[in-house]
């Protein structure tokens, strides 16, 4: 099967936006009191960020080197993260409604920036109107087949418990504690299947043609509205046949639409050209974290379930082995468009994982920007924002630039600019030059243009004659701000690349 991934993603530097937390524009009138912007985030509090606020940041992001946005869900919802969808055709009024998304798309596209939205199609919110219709009418509702109901509900002998009692909540917890897998209890206890047995998230019965068509039509409609792709939430909960049809419909509307799934591990059979273009690259994220942090990993930071037992310190050889493992399971067309992230709304921030060590964040950013795949910056990482597990990783972006740490923005801008300046970093050969303890050196080469990337995660200054696989008469250090920029050196000596690099630092060397 031909693997056809969008060409523009190879050139993309993404910026992930949590819409409620980037900026209040003042153009959306709140219906009531909001949570203080400066206060620590709470599980349910809304801070009032909106899509017009995202528009106000576009010029800053363009200067940073960003040319693509990934937005967490924007559709009408009763939750601040909006993974509880109430209407798949309507942008949340608190974000400015459909008009605000129209303006964001127009302003982004005018700046040659793409916009990818988050699609939550496995489950809806409890406020989705077909589910409300079912609550009001029971089995007499024509929407009864849109959801996974218990036999008793379908027979009309019991009602759905969408707002369960304390006893029902306790029963769900008791069954989980006894070993029942998440997602298997709610149908019996509540009368309907809910994602992870969370009552607010009824699972959609996508094998039912009208429900399936509703979701597929909404997905296609927003592509025609002008979005440039979909990031898809918990796609493994949905059948492969649905995603094949989804891809056919979406790609018919826009042959260059990007389809990226939230999959936390290897699943190469879904990346063969008939479903997804790419995944959120959490395996690479874990490897970069282990290499850049070394012994600085904060042991008290809560780990996502998918990270438990998988975070460890990597030396240079270990990092390269992890990279090679990913390359072995994915064809190059996929590797080139993987969404390479350091932080997300589902993980503690990279800087917090590393105990606040800015050198670790800088090293990881160097690797993220120079390895194959599309780098994705989580809002606020570029100004040194901290944040532990959800909801702490979803703090409000400081409105006052005086509160920002500008150093990360400087190295992000330099590295993104370097990536944009040469195809060698975007869609070209990657090969190992060597490893040396906690250091790694690799080559990015596109025709006559070649760069060596060297990262030293160790504490000591490194003097290393790196063997070269090409003839290079000259070597020059590419200026990148941050760290000990003035103490990096490189020269060609007897056919090798002799580098001098401080501890906890990295560099890019142009070979000519």
Where do the protein language model's features map onto the residues?
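N-terminal structural segment of carbohydrate-active enzymes
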Residues: 1-117, 122-134, 138-141, 145, ...
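Hydrophobic faces of well-ordered beta-strands that scaffold small-molecule active sites
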Residues: 13-15, 69-71, 115-117, 230, ...
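Aromatic/acidic polysaccharide-binding cleft in carbohydrate-active enzymes
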Residues: 20, 273-274, 278, 336-344, ...
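Carbohydrate-binding surface patches
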Residues: 433-471
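C-terminal beta-strand-rich structural cap/linker in extracellular carbohydrate-active enzymes
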Residues: 491-512
């Amino acid at each position: 099967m031909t693997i056809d991934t969008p060409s523009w993603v190879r050139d993309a530097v993404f910026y992930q936006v949590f819409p409620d937390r980037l900026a209040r524009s003042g153009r959306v009138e709140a219906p009531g009191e909001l949570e203080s912007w400066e206060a620590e985030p709470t599980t349910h509090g809304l801070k009032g960020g909106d899509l017009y606020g995202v528009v106000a940041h576009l010029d800053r992001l363009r200067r940073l080197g960003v040319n693509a946005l990934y937005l967490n869900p924007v559709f009408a919802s009763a939750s601040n993260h909006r993974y509880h969808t109430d209407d798949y055709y309507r942008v949340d009024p608190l974000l400015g409604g459909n008009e605000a998304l129209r303006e964001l798309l127009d302003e982004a596209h005018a700046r040659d920036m793409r916009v990818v939205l988050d699609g939550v199609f496995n489950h809806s919110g409890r406020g989705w109107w077909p589910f409300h219709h079912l609550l009001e009418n029971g089995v007499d509702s024509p929407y009864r087949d849109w959801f996974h109901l218990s036999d008793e509900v379908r027979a009309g002998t019991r009602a759905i418990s969408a707002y369960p009692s304390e006893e029902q909540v306790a029963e769900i917890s008791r069954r989980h504690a006894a070993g029942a897998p998440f997602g298997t209890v709610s149908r019996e206890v509540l009368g309907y299947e809910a994602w992870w047995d969370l009552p607010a998230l009824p699972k959609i019965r996508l094998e039912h043609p009208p429900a399936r068509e509703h979701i597929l039509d909404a997905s296609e409609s927003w592509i025609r509205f002008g979005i440039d792709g979909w990031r898809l939430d918990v796609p493994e909960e949905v059948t492969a046949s649905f995603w094949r049809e989804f891809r056919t419909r979406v790609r018919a509307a826009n042959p260059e639409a990007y389809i990226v799934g939230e999959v936390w591990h290897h699943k190469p059979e879904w990346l063969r050209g008939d479903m997804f273009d790419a995944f959120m690259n959490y395996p690479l994220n874990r490897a970069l974290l282990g290499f850049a942090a070394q012994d600085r990993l904060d042991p008290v930071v809560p780990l996502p379930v998918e990270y438990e037992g998988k975070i460890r310190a990597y030396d240079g050889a270990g990092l390269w082995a992890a990279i090679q493992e990913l390359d072995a399971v994915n064809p190059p067309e996929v590797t080139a468009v993987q969404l390479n992230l350091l932080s997300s709304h589902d993980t503690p921030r990279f800087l917090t994982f590393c105990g606040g060590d800015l050198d670790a964040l800088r090293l990881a950013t160097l690797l993220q920007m120079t390895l194959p795949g599309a780098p994705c910056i989580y809002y606020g990482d570029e100004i040194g924002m901290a944040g532990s597990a959800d909801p702490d990783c979803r703090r409000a972006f400081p409105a006052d630039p005086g509160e920002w740490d500008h150093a990360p923005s400087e190295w992000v801008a330099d590295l993104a600019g370097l990536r944009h300046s040469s195809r060698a970093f975007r869609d070209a050969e990657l090969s190992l030059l060597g490893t040396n303890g906690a250091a790694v050196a690799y080559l990015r080469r596109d025709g006559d243009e070649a760069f060596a990337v060297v990262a030293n995660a160790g504490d000591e200054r490194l003097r290393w004659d790196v063997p070269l696989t090409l003839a290079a008469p000259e070597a020059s250090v590419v200026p990148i701000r941050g760290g000990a920029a003035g103490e990096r050196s490189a020269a060609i000596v007897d056919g090798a690349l002799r580098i001098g690099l401080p501890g906890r630092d990295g560099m890019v060397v142009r070979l000519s």
